[in-house]
Amino acid sequence: MGRRRGVELYRAPFPLYALRIDPKTGLLIAAGGGGAAKTGIKNGVHFLQLEQISGCLSASLLHSHDTETRATMNLALAGDILAAGQDAQCQLLRFQIHQQKGSKAEKSGSKEQGPRQRKGAAPAEKKSGAEVHPEGVELKVKNLEAVQTDFSTEPLQKVVCFNHDNTLLATGGSDGHVRVWKVPSLEKVLEFKAHEGEIGDLALGPDGKLVTVGWDFKASVWQKDQLVTQLQWQENGPTSSNTPYRYQACRFGQVPDQPGGLRLFTVQIPHKRLRQPPPCYLTAWDSSTFLPLQTRSCGHEVISCLTVSESGTFLGLGTVTGSVAIYIAFSLQRLYYVKEAHGIVVTDVTFLPEKGCGPKLLGPHETALFSVAVDSRCQLHLLPSRRSVPVWLLLLLCVGLIIVTILLLQSAFPGFL
């Protein structure tokens, strides 16, 4: 078997920090930029159309939305609404895609997996907020409400996520406060101090519970603004108290084949860089008791981001050294790994959705993970379907083994039967 490697699907003209996929339209949305510094590097949100062409997954730029002087550092998706973290504010965007009548889709395309530019595509930035391509696909992006979500001395929104029914979104940032907002009005409905120092990540469960992790070494579970419990990993974990760890990321995920079942997954990384770096850890938690169920080492590369597949079957990890890995959620065993796929910090990872356009785009593979990094590249990581022996074949082999055993006994002992 050859060395695994990711496929470069798209290269943007700016560093990429956030990534989402719309299951309904098959749009891959990648965002980033160079920030406010006058370096000539633009800031934007790129909408890419994912397609299967000659059995290979391909991405082509459909629309580029200019975000002026603000780089998008984090994204959340709810239907046709994007919540984009840009500096100290959260900007809501609404995108609409529809096919123009009387146009034919482009049938030809490269057989190679990788970036594809549509014929005659207009320049990336459009002040009108809409682009129409020869294929007749039109995409419009509209700025909705925006609100400041962080108020520290150097304000920065670090994370944003929607609740299960997309009526609320929660934000966290450098000032350690969680703020919850109505969608789409962005009217603030809740605010509380969750951590001393910045919030690293947060996750909203379907029962309204909120999990936050911060640079103060704490991971807390909240019901509205009331502290329910704090995760106790290092007290019961595999590490010594001499090595301080902090929680880097948290995500809720479904339990496959258990309707309504839920798990919480967290990543723990060493707080300090040592000459001989200690391992990072991946932990699964019971979502009702918030007790650890299982912990495994996930290597000595520092983990930068975590995602969970739609069904809760797989976990995706990115590292600060550019590596990408896929783990199976129930056992926390690694199935796929590409060392230094990007060569620089992986800023976000996301799985291809398992509903909507996902199965059609996935083809014969078991899952697909997308990764973006500061190197401006979006990579595709495909996990081949694991071969399994059919039950009927196992039964046939058992019957054959019994018959052979009987024949051997009969030949060795003629009066045996």
UniProtKB/Swiss-Prot annotation:
Residues 101-135 are annotated as: Disordered. The modification 3'-nitrotyrosine is found at residue 10. One of its GO terms (molecular function) is guanyl-nucleotide exchange factor activity. It comes from the Eukaryota. Guanine nucleotide exchange factor (GEF) that regulates the assembly of the coat protein complex II/COPII in endoplasmic reticulum (ER) to Golgi vesicle-mediated transport. Selectively activates SAR1A and SAR1B by promoting the exchange of guanosine diphosphate (GDP) for guanosine triphosphate (GTP) in these small GTPases. The chain crosses the membrane at residues 389-409. It comes from Rattus norvegicus. This is Guanine nucleotide-exchange factor SEC12.
